[in-house]
């Protein structure tokens, strides 16, 4: 006996960053949301920073899926996200002041681990302790993301569902706080965190969160089976993935496409198309190896051009991003671990006016040549990039929406990226504006 569904299931797209984050995922998620009925965050926390420019108005989102800017689209925060209720409501209130309806459209998994004040305190105190001891800082955002994931893996985390049971929450919180205050005061020489303050704030947030709590896994599976197209919105980037990134200079979650299934509660067969977002050059925030890094602080250099014209400052932290040439060997690694279906190249317009462009196709490592990024920060630190030189272009590409309107040199640059990485370019972004996008192949129709 064979079951036959009466409605065709929806098609789903996963959007991931292929570099060290800040690739422009937010704009592309917003653009693709026009063809989807639900947008899902599946990992990370409010350390993410997605900037959208709609009708000239800039909006920065850190926790809520970018689809919130499209009326009628449902937004989901999956179990793979670590949730700061304080930051969530700060973001909700900001959107509501701008006239965006949020609460009736946002569904939050009851299985999300909570980020509480002691997590951020641990994050900040550890970085200070490393610096004082002469150890390199990891470069965390200080938001408590890592410590919250530690509690999850150690099976002691407080989760969103615990907020429904005040007595249970209080008992778990007291035990957890005893542990973390011991570390804060005895090892990191930082102040203790007060139980009553944390508990009272959590109970205030509990009442506000209850209407949005949901079995996100079931809702996503039901919606897709009934024909809804879903968009899974990755945060950070592949080279910040805790397993596949430049460890230990990474975030504390899996940023790769495969985690969209585990972090949202859907089967891997529901991930139909994987779109890798990559800048037309490279950037990185914080410490860690960066083979193609340029001098981005000295005026009248290419690196300075990328930094200033590209407005390369972090959305979440405001820190300057390090800048460098495009790294196709790095992108090969990202394509491999994500199973990319296609690429979207962002910030092509930032390269306007650069006379000569360099593209890294591989590295020299300990006397040998490799055409793919090695595993591990120590090996990557020793990599010497091997460059191809390509002609730049003087014409402006800002706002171009048709591929054949791009300068010939820009087309050649993009074609070479495809050749070296083996991944087709399906979309190109030519400014932060939602409408300044070239579509070569629609992920929802591919």
From Swiss-Prot:
Q: What class of enzyme is it?
A: ligase
Q: Which residues bind substrate?
A: 315-321
GO BP annotations, alphabetical order:
'de novo' AMP biosynthetic process; IMP metabolic process
Name the Gene3D superfamilies on file. Answer: Adenylosuccinate Synthetase, subunit A, domain 1, Adenylosuccinate Synthetase, subunit A, domain 2, Adenylosuccinate Synthetase, subunit A, domain 3
Q: Which domain of life is it from?
A: Bacteria
What's the catalysed reaction?
Answer: IMP + L-aspartate + GTP = N(6)-(1,2-dicarboxyethyl)-AMP + GDP + phosphate + 2 H(+)
Cofactor mode of binding and number, as noted: Binds 1 Mg(2+) ion per subunit.
Compartments reported by the entry: Cytoplasm
This protein's record includes keyword Nucleotide-binding:
yes
Kindly identify the residues recorded as the active site.
22, 50
Q: Which Enzyme Commission number(s) are on file for it?
A: 6.3.4.4
Q: In which pathway does it act?
A: Purine metabolism; AMP biosynthesis via de novo pathway; AMP from IMP: step 1/2
Q: Does the keyword Membrane apply?
A: no
Record-listed GTP binding positions: 21-27, 49-51, 321, 347-349, 429-431
Q: Where does IMP bind?
A: 22-25, 47-50, 141, 155, 236, 251, 319
The cofactors named for this UniProt entry are: Mg(2+)
- List the GO cellular component terms: cytoplasm
Tell me which UniProt keywords the record has, alphabetically: Cytoplasm, GTP-binding, Ligase, Magnesium, Metal-binding, Nucleotide-binding, Purine biosynthesis
The family line of this record is: Belongs to the adenylosuccinate synthetase family.
User: Whom does it interact with, and what assembly results?
Assistant: Homodimer.
According to its UniProt entry, the function of this protein is described as: Plays an important role in the de novo pathway of purine nucleotide biosynthesis. Catalyzes the first committed step in the biosynthesis of AMP from IMP.
Kindly provide the name given to this protein in its UniProt entry: Adenylosuccinate synthetase
Q: Which organism is it from?
A: Polaromonas sp. (strain JS666 / ATCC BAA-500)
């Amino acid at each position: 006996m064979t079951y036959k569904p009466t409605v065709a299931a929806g098609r789903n797209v996963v959007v991931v960053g292929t570099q060290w984050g800040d690739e422009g995922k937010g704009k592309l998620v917003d653009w693709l949301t026009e063809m989807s009925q639900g947008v899902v965050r599946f990992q990370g926390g409010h350390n993410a920073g997605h900037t959208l420019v709609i009708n000239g108005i800039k909006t920065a989102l850190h926790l809520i899926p970018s689809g919130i800017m499209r009326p009628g689209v449902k937004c989901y925060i999956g179990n793979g996200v670590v949730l700061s209720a304080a930051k969530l409501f700060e973001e909700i209130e900001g959107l509501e002041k701008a006239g965006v309806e949020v609460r009736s459209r946002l569904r939050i998994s009851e299985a999300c681990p909570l980020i509480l004040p002691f997590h951020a305190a641990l994050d900040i105190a550890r970085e200070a302790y490393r610096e004082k001891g002469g150890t390199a800082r990891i470069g965390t955002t200080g938001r408590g993301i890592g410590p919250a994931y530690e509690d999850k893996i150690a099976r002691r985390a407080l989760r969103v569902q615990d907020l429904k049971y005040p007595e249970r929450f209080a008992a778990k919180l007291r035990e957890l706080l005893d542990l973390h205050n011991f570390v804060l005061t005895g090892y990191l020489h930082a102040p203790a965190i007060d139980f009553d303050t944390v508990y009272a704030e959590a109970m205030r947030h509990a009442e506000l969160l209850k209407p949005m709590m949901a079995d996100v896994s079931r809702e996503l599976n039901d919606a897709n089976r009934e024909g809804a197209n879903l968009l899974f919105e990755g945060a950070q980037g592949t080279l910040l993935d805790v397993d596949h990134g430049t460890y230990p200079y990474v975030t504390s979650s899996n940023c790769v496409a495969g985690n969209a299934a585990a972090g949202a509660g859907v089967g891997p067969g529901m991930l139909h198309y994987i779109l890798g977002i990559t800048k037309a050059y490279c950037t990185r925030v914080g410490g860690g190896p960066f083979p193609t890094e340029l001098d981005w602080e000295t005026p009248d250099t290419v690196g300075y051009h990328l930094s200033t014209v590209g407005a390369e400052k972090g959305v979440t932290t405001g820190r300057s991003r390090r800048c460098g040439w495009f790294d196709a060997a790095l992108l090969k690694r990202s394509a491999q671990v994500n199973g990319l279906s296609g690429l979207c190249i962002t910030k092509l317009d930032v390269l306007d006016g650069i006379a000569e462009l360099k593209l890294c196709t591989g590295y020299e490592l300990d006397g040998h040549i490799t055409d793919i990024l090695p595993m591990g920060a120590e090996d990557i630190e020793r990599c010497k990039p091997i460059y191809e030189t390509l002609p730049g272009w003087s014409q402006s590409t800002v706002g171009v929406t048709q591929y054949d309107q791009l300068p010939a040199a820009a087309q050649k640059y993009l074609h070479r990226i495809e050749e070296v990485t083996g991944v087709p370019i399906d979309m190109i972004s030519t400014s932060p504006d939602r409408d300044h996008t070239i579509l070569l192949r629609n992920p929802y129709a591919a």
